[in-house]
Amino acid sequence: MLVHKPSFSTSLPTDLDGYREAYSETLSMADEVRRVTGLEVGVVLGPHPVVWEHQIEPLGLSASTELHLEAVSLALDYIEEGNAICLGEVGRPHYPVNEETWTSASELLLEVMGMAAAEGCAIQLHVEDNGETTYREMAQLCDKAGLPRDRAIRHYAPADVSPEFTNGLAATVSVGKGSIEGLVSTVTSKSAPWGMETDFLDDSRRPGAVLGPKTVPKRTQELCSTLLREGWEEDDVSNLMDSIHREWPKRLYSIL
């Protein structure tokens, strides 16, 4: 999965043409990877919520919100054309903001979810880490917007995949150190679909950030061996790995 990320080190898009150019760069990058490596590359495309928040001061809340929604609509056009497969990252700022901004962020996300639901499109969420409360609030927004909860994929999720914690939302878990213990203690047959992620940036200024690309194979092996030690049957472990790395991603990152 190649996820569109704004370049905060350069100027952020201030109009729809700017977003069109930024999206095109990500899509071109995906084409290059396919051509050079022969790998399948799915693109997650959309305006980042942090960009929206950063642009409130220079553009004003109304203009920043209008631009964000236009950028969502543009991303959905690319998705409909088959150039991308998921809307994201969308969501809320993951850091403290004032009450007006926070309320506006939730209202904006509700509208974005409604747009995705209308297109039968999954979304990848960039949200704050406030434990089960974050999941519960996201689930409530999904229900209001008519977006199935398992079509909202929480990015950089904590290693708790119990249904009581996730409230039925899908998740890609950041598989850093200590994550396997959390997964082993919370995974059940009732868990919503989830996967593993590194949030790898390929940024020369932050080498290896957030986690290196070899992390997922390493954690997969660690998860398998730990589950077997915990008494899981080999077939059950194999089926779970097939779900994590094939079935669930194929289902989550698709157009229904």
PLM-predicted stretches and their roles:
Residues 1-119, 125, 136-145, 158-160, ...:
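Mid-domain alpha/beta scaffold segments of enzyme catalytic cores
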Residues 129-132:
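Gly/Ser/Thr-rich loops at beta-strand to alpha-helix junctions
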Residues 149-152, 169-177, 194-196:
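Short hydrophobic/aromatic-enriched beta-strand-loop microsegments
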Residues 153-166:
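Class I S-adenosyl-L-methionine
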Residues 166-169, 190:
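Short, structured coil segments at secondary-structure junctions
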Residues 229:
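Conserved phosphoryl-transfer catalytic core
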Residues 127, 156-157, 173-175, 198:
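Active-site proximal loops enriched in glycine and acidic residues that flank catalytic Cys/His/Asp
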Residues 188-203, 254:
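Conserved short secondary-structure transition element at the edge of the structured enzyme core
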